[in-house]
């Protein structure tokens, strides 16, 4: 766990609002030192959804966030030590992406793909490229500095994509230094119930 985390904000569409509020109640019992807040963006369809980045902006606005933030997709299961990710951010003081070296370029087509220099700075970043330039895949986990948060509104105001969260750092690295933390371990995108149950069995959790 990252001891510096004192608030957890979860944003959802209206359909799953009650489910997440129930989860937050249980989570608060396990982590009483952390304040949990669920935000219902009020949307009910693909036509009205805000998109991942639109939802992040929704929380920034409504929660009046003014702090460094860790943003991650709730459907990603990772086995690495999150503390190391945060320590890297503290050490360098730059916006930080979570990355992993994949085995093949074909696998990378499902992710944002980064080119890094020897110090881990992002030199190129593209969301789900048809022709990946490296095997460094960027996962949906980011630590952004407090002074980076207002830039998301600028990004959206320019008419850029509000959907996949990887689009924002692809815009951001061209304007300020962005680094990547390359982790060792596994991250699984839980896109189906079968994948969820598989992960539960492998890591001795109770499947549903």
Predicted regions mapped to residue ranges:
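A short acidic, often aromatic-flanked loop/helix-cap motif at beta-alpha or helix-coil junctions
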Residues: 42-48, 105-106, 131, 187-189
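Short acidic-glycine loop/turn motifs at beta-strand connectors
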Residues: 115-121
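Conserved N-terminal catalytic core of the sugar/cofactor nucleotidyltransferase
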Residues: 1-72, 77, 82
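Short, surface-exposed amphipathic charged segments that create phosphate/polyanion-binding patches used
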Residues: 48-57, 111-115, 140, 194-198
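Catalytic-core segments of class I nucleotidyltransferases/pyrophosphorylases
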Residues: 77, 86-90, 121-208
């Amino acid at each position: 766990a990252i001891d510096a985390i004192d608030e957890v904000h979860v944003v959802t569409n209206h359909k799953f609002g009650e489910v997440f509020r129930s989860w937050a109640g249980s989570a608060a019992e396990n982590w009483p030192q952390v304040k949990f807040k669920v935000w219902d963006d009020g949307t009910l369809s693909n036509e009205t959804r805000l998109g991942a980045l639109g939802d992040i902006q929704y929380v920034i606005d409504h929660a009046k966030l003014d702090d460094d933030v860790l943003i991650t997709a709730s459907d990603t299961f990772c086995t690495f030590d999150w503390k190391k990710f945060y320590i890297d951010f503290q050490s360098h003081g730059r916006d930080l992406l979570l990355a992993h070296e994949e085995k093949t370029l074909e696998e990378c087509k499902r992710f944002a793909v980064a080119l890094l220099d020897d110090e881990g700075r992002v030199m190129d970043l593209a969301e789900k490229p048809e022709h990946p330039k490296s095997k460094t895949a960027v996962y949906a986990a980011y630590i952004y500095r407090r002074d980076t948060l207002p830039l998301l509104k600028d990004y959206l105001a320019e008419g850029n994509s509000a959907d996949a969260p990887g689009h924002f750092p692809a815009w951001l690295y061209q304007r300020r230094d962005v680094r990547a933390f390359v982790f060792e371990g596994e991250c699984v995108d839980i896109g189906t119930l079968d994948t969820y149950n598989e992960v539960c069995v492998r890591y001795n959790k109770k499947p549903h």
